């Protein structure tokens, strides 16, 4: 049975693949921080520390990747322009066209993180972050993890642990250069995918 979600994915993926087929694979690789293997007709990239390979020219995925994760990768490869990655962090609401959808996502994510963090120890959180490909970095937050969702598309998860006065809380942030690589619709999808992975690891 073809659901509305499946149809939407298929239509958007087809459009993205057509755009990519019209471009030079070598140029796509350079602009996106990926690797082009002309001998084997493959484009290789990394998402959350995992290797992802696409068969050219149809840009089909070798590994099993969830549909909307596939679409984000295709859109990233299409939009990437090799803009240097900024270390300046912004909220989803600060993205171009992010005032409504991005701001709503920021609020929803803070609520989801509050539920996710409840009852988890600092050590548990470190283990979950590591299992999802995150890197612990210095920050004013109690815990700050950087996730390279794609080569030039980092996210930062900042966590403040619970104390006598406050419950644990968190924020998910993007790079100021994020608009050069994905539109806000895909950005919120990326945030959702990362949250799902964090939950999945914590449930194991």
Roles of regions detected by a PLM:
Residues 74-81, 194, 198:
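Generic structural signal for hydrophobic core residues of well-folded globular domains
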Residues 120-180:
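Conserved binding-pocket/active-site segment within a compact domain
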Residues 63, 111, 115-118, 143, ...:
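Short, charged/polar micro-motifs that form catalytic or ligand-binding hotspots
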Residues 50-75, 160-185:
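Intrinsically disordered, low-complexity regulatory segments enriched in Ser/Thr/Pro
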Residues 175-204:
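A recognition module on extended beta-rich or small alphabeta surfaces enriched in W/G with H and D/E
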Residues 28-56, 135-161:
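Amphipathic, interaction-prone secondary-structure segments
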Residues 1-40, 69, 76-133:
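Short Lys/Arg-enriched alpha/beta "domain-start" segment
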